[in-house]
Curated annotation (Swiss-Prot):
Any one Gene Ontology molecular-function term assigned to this protein's record: histone H4K20 methyltransferase activity
Name of the top EC class for this enzyme: transferase
Catalytic activity: L-lysyl-[histone] + S-adenosyl-L-methionine = N(6)-methyl-L-lysyl-[histone] + S-adenosyl-L-homocysteine + H(+)
Keyword Nuclease recorded: no
Highest rank taxon of the organism: Eukaryota
InterPro entries: SET_dom, SET_dom_sf
Main localization, broad class: nucleus
Identification of the protein by name: Histone-lysine N-methyltransferase SET5
Keyword terms, alphabetized: Chromosome, Cytoplasm, Methyltransferase, Nucleus, S-adenosyl-L-methionine, Transferase
The UniProt record lists the keyword Transferase: yes
Name of the gene encoding the protein in the UniProt record: SET5
Organism: Meyerozyma guilliermondii (strain ATCC 6260 / CBS 566 / DSM 6381 / JCM 1539 / NBRC 10279 / NRRL Y-324)
Role summary: Histone methyltransferase that monomethylates 'Lys-5', 'Lys-8' and 'Lys-12' of histone H4 (H4K5me1, H4K8me1 and H4K12me1, respectively), thereby controlling gene expression and remodeling chromatin structures.
A Pfam family reported for this protein in Swiss-Prot or TrEMBL: SET
Amino acid sequence: MIDKLDGQQEPKVEILDINDHVQESSDPVVPHERQIIDDIIAIWKEDPSSESLGVPKLHAKVKSRHPTWSVSEKRVRTLLKTYGLITTNQQFTYANEIHSRIVSSIELPPKVKVTMTAKRGKGLYAKTQIRKGDLIWEERPLFFVPALANVKLVRTGRACAYCAKLLTQRSSTGLSALRGLDCNVCPELWCSKDCKTLDTLHAKLKHNMSSHSNGKGSNLIDASGFIALEDYCFQEQWNALYAITLIYAEMQADKTRTKAEYFSSMARVSQKVRYKAINSSAGSFDTMQGGALFVMEQQEALWNEGYQKFLKVFPSAHDQVPFEEFMMMMGTYNINNLDSCIFLTQSHLNHSCHPNTDVQASTASRTGPLKVFAARDIKAGEELTTSYVNPSHTLHQRQRELRVNWGFICSCQRCKDEAKEHHRRKSSNGMGAKEVPSNIREMLKDTKSAIGNSEIELEIPTVQGGERRKSVRFDEHVISVNQ
């Protein structure tokens, strides 16, 4: 529609609501506790530095975002404590429920020894002085886990049958067959001779469809059960179940039982215990969801369903892997994996927010060797450490991620120093606007000191087990111009 003024055309401007935006009522409203927690989490995600705000200032921010909300400072404080979002000594930790042991048969790098201590548990220590930049060791995965997201592409020959790397059109057609990189039973292909050699489980997992054969080895793995489990893991985005299925298959195929011995010696904890920490921290906040995936009853039902599918892959595992051991395997995998894979020597490294090693994954291939360098000079007898979390995160972020995912509250020197600085700022008149640039410079300086010249890999937010939003909000309103 066009309005005509003095013979000229002038567009008519109209304000429209888009997406799922709902205009808040001007009447006072008492929000649900989940709404308050979700809003606080949103504030922290938008500005990580706001996580260090005291309750009064945080309450003021919530009120400024939702003027009609009837919520007191006392209620905000109570909810933060209830959901484990205030760092206190009463927060749930499970480090004392994690157990590991030393296996003498492990071949360690020449400059490294493994030691068990009462305070740190099992860890790696330097036998001699190590210079900054020295390669301490390199290793291939003990258990390789391909990308779950590519399993459908693997089945149609569009991704490598072992490493799941995407194949080009040229490599996924006749050329691979000529090079002997195709399977003569199914459509799957390998990207290289190395991957084909490493893929010792392909026939057992993909072609052994009968679990009732009289052959002793043929009934260890039921391929039809594995394909069903693979589909289920893909649908639920459940990487841990997929991973421990592959790990158990590897252990079953290892006649020396060495791999089973190594896996059982790693830091072990039940996934049930880890889930308590998730529930005590406003759900899976650190997986960008802002809420628990399921209430405990639903989660236990999911675990049981996964366990039943696991048993269909391994018909003889009913006695060898009871449900509690299944949960222990899942917890063990979750606290030891690096980029979904398990590395034997690297799994011995304990955490520090100011680590003295630089762990670098292979840039050429996920199946390639992991390399561990000295990030600074390391004295003989000094413990080797790595960072389990992104060192550029704030103190509160790091502490929460470590408590939920690994069961402890870090007390390294960097955390102590930052905690003292945080308390000093809180006891002062507050951080003024003029102090912000200097604080940012200090943060960047600390991060540079922590990570050296290595790059920071930022995680892509994912939602596990949930659906993506079907709309994208760019603004509360959009201007529509009709001409």
